[in-house]
């Protein structure tokens, strides 16, 4: 059961022992209603970790994936989980643990959204909520349960969360969970699961305590390392424009259009409604733009992406859902009309401006309310976002 390949791990980094990739969702043999959910969610093609990790999980291997936040790892295990569960069996078949309530709820939303066309229930089992409500929800036998270690452990001990149909156990952000002192509860949960349960572990770092979990509880795991440098801010000039009020962003954008010759740009907004609103406003001012968000069906989105890739449409306005699917070489400029609601998405939005070794420019519209988020982003990525200079046109 112990895995020999992990004894001498350099500086908390695992070595990949699996290099097969599947570069389209269509090639993964997913259930039709799951594939429909994947596309409806806004994915176009799998990210690096999705190309590598979804298939070994579906095939039933224990999998260790070392990947940073924001690489698409939540969807990696959500898609694999949904593929493996039997929707006719009303019992928990997959248990997903996360270090915080917020992350658990976020994962639940992703599972529910991607599983939208499947008859599958997913319950979030987290502290700070009513134990009675939890017990009631678990008695209905949701096929997927996602939760924090304390509450999940409690529910298994009360025999409300039954483990006899459990096929899969996912630990997300394992390093975080162990550093928060959940080690004992996690070990206890392992002991209460059927011996045959498949284990999938995701972690940004591989400290000793995480390696111990992998050697104790995983059988001959597939190891996948998605290096940090697959997403980088290097070569991307990042600026901000201070905008006094939200209402002034539109004029700021129009002014920018006047100063800068845009070969191709993506403008990100935080909501679908804002995308539609901005598209209407810019069209009314005679700017040619296309828009794309998760409310559109796949066929519509394909047409828009094709136009954008071919260059017949030069400006694309989109939501975060699509940040991961836009892979366009010519994008020289990314504008965050809204700063992303979570900092992990920042690199997904602007990292693409500099892909394929191209240089790019990112411009963030920042109101007084956004300053804190901008500082957080700077800290998180150890980067600097400077005030936009007058000669910005020369940089693009």
Swiss-Prot record:
GO terms for biological process: cytoplasmic translational initiation. Its main location: cytoplasm. Its EC number is 3.6.4.13. PROSITE patterns: DEAD_ATP_HELICASE, HELICASE_ATP_BIND_1, HELICASE_CTER, Q_MOTIF. It is found in: Cytoplasm. Residues 235-396 form the Helicase C-terminal domain. InterPro entries: DEAD/DEAH_box_helicase_dom (IPR011545), EIF4A_DEADc (IPR044728), Helicase_ATP-bd (IPR014001), Helicase_C-like (IPR001650), P-loop_NTPase (IPR027417), RNA-helicase_DEAD-box_CS (IPR000629), RNA_helicase_DEAD_Q_motif (IPR014014). Residues 1-20 are annotated as: Disordered. CDD domains: DEADc_EIF4AII_EIF4AI_DDX2, SF2_C_DEAD. SUPFAM superfamilies: P-loop containing nucleoside triphosphate hydrolases. A motif (Q motif) lies at residues 23-51. It comes from the Eukaryota. Residues 54-224 form the Helicase ATP-binding domain. Signal peptide: none annotated. Keywords: ATP-binding, Cytoplasm, Helicase, Hydrolase, Initiation factor, Nucleotide-binding, Protein biosynthesis, RNA-binding. GO terms for cellular component: cytoplasmic stress granule. One of its GO terms (molecular function) is translation initiation factor activity. Belongs to the DEAD box helicase family. eIF4A subfamily. ATP-dependent RNA helicase which is a subunit of the eIF4F complex involved in cap recognition and is required for mRNA binding to ribosome. In the current model of translation initiation, eIF4A unwinds RNA secondary structures in the 5'-UTR of mRNAs which is necessary to allow efficient binding of the small ribosomal subunit, and subsequent scanning for the initiator codon. PANTHER family: ATP-DEPENDENT RNA HELICASE DBP3. This is ATP-dependent RNA helicase eIF4A. It comes from Phaeosphaeria nodorum (strain SN15 / ATCC MYA-4574 / FGSC 10173) (Glume blotch fungus). The gene is TIF1.
